[in-house]
Amino acid sequence: MSVTTKDVAYIAELARLKFTDAEQEKMASELNMILHYIEKLNGIDTEGVEPLSTIHDQINVLRADVEHTPLSNDEALKNAPDSQDRFFKVPKVIG
């Protein structure tokens, strides 16, 4: 399987991204390198190798939960660039 610049252009259109021709060439090359690596991984014999659920033998290494008072809405919105009706106001991102 090989990724062409046409494939990159199609995927970019779906994601609403714009690439120059040079960027499309580079992206196609990088995606082809990734696919080549995956093909190498698929060729590895893993017969008899037990799957890992984790790479560490340690369990419960997360921090302990500590109860604390959360920020009030006013405190949280104090640093917001824009707010409306006690909510963060952000620019529209979907057409």
UniProtKB/Swiss-Prot annotation:
Record-annotated disulphide pairs: none
Pfam families linked: GatC
Signal sequence segment: none
Substrates-to-products reaction catalysed: L-glutamyl-tRNA(Gln) + L-glutamine + ATP + H2O = L-glutaminyl-tRNA(Gln) + L-glutamate + ADP + phosphate + H(+); L-aspartyl-tRNA(Asn) + L-glutamine + ATP + H2O = L-asparaginyl-tRNA(Asn) + L-glutamate + ADP + phosphate + 2 H(+)
Enzyme class: ligase
Gene3D superfamilies: Glu-tRNAGln amidotransferase C subunit, N-terminal domain
GO biological process: glutaminyl-tRNAGln biosynthesis via transamidation; regulation of translational fidelity; translation
Top-level taxon of origin: Bacteria
Annotated EC: 6.3.5.-
TM region positions: none
Keyword Ligase found: yes
InterPro entries: Asp/Glu-ADT_sf_sub_c (IPR036113), GatC (IPR003837)
GO molecular function, one term: ATP binding
Keywords associated with the record: ATP-binding, Ligase, Nucleotide-binding, Protein biosynthesis
Assembly behavior: Heterotrimer of A, B and C subunits.
Role, per record: Allows the formation of correctly charged Asn-tRNA(Asn) or Gln-tRNA(Gln) through the transamidation of misacylated Asp-tRNA(Asn) or Glu-tRNA(Gln) in organisms which lack either or both of asparaginyl-tRNA or glutaminyl-tRNA synthetases. The reaction takes place in the presence of glutamine and ATP through an activated phospho-Asp-tRNA(Asn) or phospho-Glu-tRNA(Gln).
Protein family (similarity comment): Belongs to the GatC family.
The protein, known as: Aspartyl/glutamyl-tRNA(Asn/Gln) amidotransferase subunit C
Organism: Chlorobaculum tepidum (strain ATCC 49652 / DSM 12025 / NBRC 103806 / TLS) (Chlorobium tepidum)
